[in-house]
Amino acid sequence: MLIAALALASALVVALGWQLYQARENQRWLSQRATQPYIGMYVPRIAMTSLDGASRRLGEPAADYQVLYFFTTGCPHCRASAPLVKAIAGQLDAASGGRAEMLGIALDPPAAADAYAREHGFAFPVIASQDRRSAMLFRARNVPLLLVIGRDGRVRYARVGAINTKEGVNGVLTAVRRKEASPAGPTTKES
């Protein structure tokens, strides 16, 4: 009888431990889903003005794809990513067959964003926006953030963190080569 009671108590402890583990995993997944960009996520369409004075629509590609690069001028990871971001911009037309546009979104004042874009030789339009609410709609809590948006307004590729490897470049270029959108699923690649 005592052995049966101990076995039952042990089984109960294991079952409760497993339920606690699953609850924590679900909470982590929900928290990440609510705060990080993910493949298949719909993004809003927001009108903004780039530093060159042109009207731009984030989340609404003029072509088949829109590559959005969120950064801040004081971020060391953004500075480290700048050379490969510039390389991505240079290879985008060839990889997408001219069906992709790239926009930089600096979460800084216009003067700082313009100086940063010139310093790093960004040949793509840059938008200066200090509106954190707009950035949060794209889940740009952490920078650098690189998103590839399809014509349907869904994220096809998301990368949070430094873009400092060829894999980061290839991920973006592969996303703009694909014909079909990826299904919704959890994932951001962090480095």
Segments (PLM) and residue ranges:
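Short active-site neighborhood of thiol/selenol oxidoreductases, capturing the structured segment around
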Residues: R56-R79, V85
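Compositionally biased, proline/threonine/alanine/serine-rich low-complexity intrinsically disordered stretches
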Residues: R178-S191
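Hydrophobic beta-strand anchors of alpha/beta hydrolase catalytic cores
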Residues: V67-L68, M102, L146
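Short acidic-hydrophobic, aromatic-tinged amphipathic segments that line or gate anion-handling sites
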Residues: M48-T49, P125-S129
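Short, small/polar residue-rich loop motifs at catalytic or cofactor-binding pockets
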Residues: Y42, D64, R141-V143
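Structural microenvironment flanking redox-active thiols in thiol-disulfide oxidoreductases
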Residues: R79-H120, R133-M136
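N-terminal targeting signals for export/organelle localization
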Residues: M1-V43, S191
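Thiol/disulfide oxidoreductase modules built on the thioredoxin-like
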Residues: R118-F122, Q130-R177
